Amino acid sequence: MYLPDRIRKKVDKLAYGINSVGMSGASVLCYDDMVLKIGRDAEDHERSKAMLSYLEGKLPAPRIIEACEENGLCYMLMTRIKGKMACAGEYTDNAAELLPILADGIKLLWRVDTHGCPQQNMLDTKLAHARRSVELGLCDEDNVQPGTYGPDGFSSPKELYAWLAANRPDEERVFSHGDLCLPNVFIDGGRISGFIDLGWAGVTDIYQDIALCYRSLVNNRDGKYGTAHPYFDADALFSLLDIEPDRDKLYYYTMLDELF
């Protein structure tokens, strides 16, 4: 495999495994204490660099060792987070252990000082990105929540975007991970050890993370990615966050994510 010199010098002859979890389309090589992400999305590469630099010392997240672009590919070598993904069977088999850890993780995100945050991902920004994805035909219509499209849903991404633009909810600003699904949360020793894939992190509405975390819990409960866990009470997350769930906003931010 070809690697730029500045990356190769750090990893040459080191053993690695391939991480196949995730839907970004990037290749992820896992070394003992480093991770190398290789992809073609230059925008995500720049967003990730900005946010990982900003979050150093503020949140448990990878530290950038080297990052560069060459021949149309983006390379980012980072420190490896200890622990296991929150979607590991030992956690999804035990809601009583997993849910309090996730709730603590969300509260940890909310406590990040947003002064000087390089990314403001409020709805103006998110909807503009969604509109561009629709116009360029980049939206995945297959890997979506049941009912998003079809007889009981929207006829197309264009119709979904129009609904999102016409039904914008009020926004409550907090720091957000941006894609808080279980594979992006790592746990070690019964607590959050780190967050990964922070390209869409920044200031946005409080329900951005709640909605995607809840969706991820429901999908894992229902067996979308493997074994079903029918007694897993995903709704218990809300009481652990000390909130009464706003079902309209949960739906809105889940649907918004279908255009990303």
Where are the language model's segments positioned?
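An alpha-helical support segment within catalytic cores of ATP-dependent transferases
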Residues: 2-8, 111-178, 246
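Conserved N-terminal boundary motif of the eukaryotic protein kinase catalytic domain
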Residues: 10-19
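ATP-binding pocket architecture of kinase catalytic cores
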Residues: 18-122
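Alpha-helical elements of Rossmann-like donor-binding domains used by nucleotide-donor carbohydrate transfer enzymes
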Residues: 50-54, 101-108, 129, 159, ...
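Short, surface-exposed acidic
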Residues: 153-154, 239-252
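Active-site Asp-x-Gly
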Residues: 170-176, 188-245
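Hydrophobic residue at the +6 position relative to the catalytic HRD Asp in the kinase catalytic loop
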Residues: 183-187
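C-terminal accessory extensions appended to soluble enzyme cores
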Residues: 252-259
